[in-house]
C-alpha cells in the first residue's frame, strides 16, 4: 500500500488499498467459499480520515456476506462501487447476491456500520429485504 507522497502519509491510493483489503479478507475464507468481486472504484487518493472507516465498513460487510449470506451453492457475487456523485459528495455502494436474513438488521454489525457512517459525517441507507447498502458522505 503506497502513500500518495512518501512524505505525506495522510493519504493512500484508494484503488490499491481497497483491492488489497478485499483480497486479504476473502483469502481468509478461501477454503470455505469462492467469492467473485466487481470493484468499480475511483482512481485517486483518499485521506486517512475516510479510508480507515471505509476499510472497517468493508471488512464488516464482506465478512458478514461470507459468514451469513452465502449459504447456498452457486455464484457468489459481491459488488463494491465507490464514486463521486457531485460537488464533493461521495457514494460507497455495497451489495451481494446472497440470502438476506431479516432478523439480524438490528445487531452489533448494523450498529457498527452506523457508528462508522457517523465518523464519515455521512448517511447509511439499506434497501428493504436485500443486502444493498449505501453510504453517502462529503470529503470536505
Where in this protein do the model-derived segments appear?
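Short beta-to-alpha transition helix within the HATPase_c
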Residues: 8-28, 83
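Glycine-rich nucleotide-binding loop
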Residues: 77, 100, 128-135
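Short beta-strand/loop element within the Bergerat-fold HATPase_c
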Residues: 75-88
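Conserved short alpha-helical segment within the C-terminal cytosolic histidine kinase catalytic core
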Residues: 4, 20-32, 53, 57-60, ...
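Conserved DxG motif in ATP/Mg2+-binding regions
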Residues: 91-98
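Conserved short strand/loop->alpha-helix "switch" segment adjacent to the catalytic nucleotide/phosphoryl-transfer site
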Residues: 30-62, 66-74
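Flexible helix-coil linker/loop segments in the cytosolic histidine kinase module
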Residues: 1-13, 68-70
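ATP phosphate-binding glycine-rich loop and adjacent ATP-lid/helix-beta elements
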Residues: 100-127
Amino acid at each position: 500500500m503506497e502513500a500518495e507522497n512518501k512524505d505525506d502519509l495522510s493519504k493512500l491510493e484508494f484503488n490499491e488499498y481497497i483491492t488489497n483489503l478485499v483480497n486479504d479478507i476473502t483469502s481468509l475464507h478461501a477454503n470455505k467459499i469462492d467469492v467473485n468481486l466487481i470493484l468499480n472504484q475511483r482512481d485517486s487518493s483518499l485521506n486517512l480520515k475516510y479510508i480507515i472507516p471505509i476499510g472497517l465498513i468493508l471488512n464488516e460487510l464482506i465478512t458478514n456476506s461470507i459468514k451469513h449470506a452465502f449459504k447456498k451453492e452457486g455464484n457468489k457475487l459481491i459488488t463494491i462501487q465507490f464514486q463521486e456523485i457531485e460537488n464533493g459528495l461521495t457514494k460507497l455502494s455495497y451489495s451481494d447476491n446472497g440470502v438476506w436474513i431479516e432478523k439480524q438488521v438490528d445487531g452489533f454489525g448494523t450498529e457498527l456500520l452506523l457508528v462508522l457512517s457517523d465518523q464519515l459525517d455521512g448517511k447509511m441507507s439499506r434497501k428493504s429485504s436485500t443486502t444493498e447498502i449505501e453510504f453517502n458522505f462529503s470529503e470536505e
